[in-house]
């Protein structure tokens, strides 16, 4: 049975369960279960600390895992990056008091940096050629500056609200742009049918979130221009209507372009423009 690790708590937990659920798997826990089996598809979902998932996968204890890219890199685990999952986007940044003029390029051996991501920070400092002091904390690093423990923090920033409320601001460019990822031990893991099916299903959900289907009726004389606006994946579907000189067109378009596409189609005298969400797809 294929074992897939999902985060048991934290910002990535809900997104991971929702994604697997939408992909057709039974993965929802009743209470605080440590694992859930889906015998129909030969999969067991194991709920682990997000920080530990890449390590379990790298040792072959778990076949696949959903965790953060930041946590994967910080663990130092040797895993294969299978897919970006499209949720949990954040930046891993340095932050300092808003009144500070300190920048990463000005770090010295006396600069104290509090973080829960020792490996990521040490790697960045090494690339900068700086031997600053890294202070390892297990969460809630924002308060460390106020308590006089650190001069700077390095942490994951999503909205920025938490560091703003702590009187801090990010400094320098992000060390890493992170999001949820699917990881495997090695390429051989993905040769398993159950692993391939899971990855393909999840990929279908991710793509479906990025695209919609647009349908419209159009004077046939404007079809060449319409094809440029809605080219589809391979080609738009074009069908004749029971009205001379008119056709029905159907195509996938990027979700973020919906309103601009509708504006352009309206200028071509398109009628009955309908946009439909896609639940899942295979490209």
From Swiss-Prot:
One example of the protein's molecular function in GO is: magnesium ion binding
Q: Per its Swiss-Prot or TrEMBL record, what regulates the activity? A: Feedback inhibited by histidine.
Q: Which CDD domains match?
A: PBP2_HisGL1
User: Which pathway or pathways does this protein act in?
Assistant: Amino-acid biosynthesis; L-histidine biosynthesis; L-histidine from 5-phospho-alpha-D-ribose 1-diphosphate: step 1/9
Is-annotated flag, keyword Repressor?
A: no
Which cofactor(s) does the record list? Answer: Mg(2+)
Please give the superkingdom of this protein's source: Bacteria
Report the EC number(s), separated by commas if there are several: 2.4.2.17
InterPro entries cross-referenced by the UniProt entry: ATP-PRT_HisG_long, ATP_PRibTrfase_cat, ATP_PRibTrfase_CS, ATP_PRibTrfase_HisG, HisG_C, N-reg_PII-like_a/b, N-reg_PII/ATP_PRibTrfase_C
> What NCBIfam families has UniProt attached to this entry?
hisG, HisG_C-term
- The protein's role, per its UniProt record: Catalyzes the condensation of ATP and 5-phosphoribose 1-diphosphate to form N'-(5'-phosphoribosyl)-ATP (PR-ATP). Has a crucial role in the pathway because the rate of histidine biosynthesis seems to be controlled primarily by regulation of HisG enzymatic activity.
Family classification: Belongs to the ATP phosphoribosyltransferase family. Long subfamily.
The cross-references to PANTHER family, in alphabetical order and at most eight, read: ATP PHOSPHORIBOSYLTRANSFERASE (PTHR21403:SF8), ATP PHOSPHORIBOSYLTRANSFERASE ATP-PRTASE (PTHR21403)
Extract the HAMAP family matched here.
HisG_Long
Record-given protein name: ATP phosphoribosyltransferase
Organism of derivation: Salinibacter ruber (strain DSM 13855 / M31)
Name the lineage.
Bacteria, Pseudomonadati, Rhodothermota, Rhodothermia, Rhodothermales
């Amino acid at each position: 049975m294929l074992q897939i690790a999902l985060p048991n708590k934290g910002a990535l937990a809900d997104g991971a369960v929702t994604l697997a659920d939408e992909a057709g798997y039974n993965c929802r826990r009743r209470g605080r279960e440590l694992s859930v089996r889906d015998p129909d598809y030969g999969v067991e979902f194991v709920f682990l600390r997000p920080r530990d998932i890449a390590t379990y996968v790298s040792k072959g204890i778990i076949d696949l895992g959903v965790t953060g890219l930041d946590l994967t890199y910080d663990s130092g685990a040797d895993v294969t990056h299978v897919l970006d999952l499209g949720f949990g986007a954040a930046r891993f940044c340095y932050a300092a008091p808003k009144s500070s003029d300190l920048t990463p390029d000005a770090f010295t051996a006396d600069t104290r940096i509090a973080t829960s991501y020792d490996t990521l920070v040490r790697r960045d400092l090494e690339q900068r050629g700086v031997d600053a002091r890294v202070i390892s904390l297990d969460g809630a690093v924002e308060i460390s500056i106020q308590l006089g423990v650190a001069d700077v923090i390095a942490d994951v920033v999503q909205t920025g609200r938490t560091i703003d409320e702590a009187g801090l601001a990010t400094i320098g460019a992000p060390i890493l742009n992170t999001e949820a990822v699917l990881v495997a031990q090695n390429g051989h893991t993905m040769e398993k049918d159950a692993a391939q099916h899971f990855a393909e299903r999840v990929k279908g959900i991710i793509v479906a979130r990025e695209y919609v289907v647009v349908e419209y009726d159009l004077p046939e004389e404007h079809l060449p221009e319409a094809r440029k606006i809605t080219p589809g994946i391979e080609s738009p579907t074009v069908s004749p209507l029971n009205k001379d000189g008119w056709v029905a067109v159907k195509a996938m378009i990027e979700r973020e372009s919906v309103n601009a596409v509708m504006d352009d189609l309206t200028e071509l005298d398109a009628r009955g423009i309908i946009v439909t969400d896609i639940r899942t797809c295979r490209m």
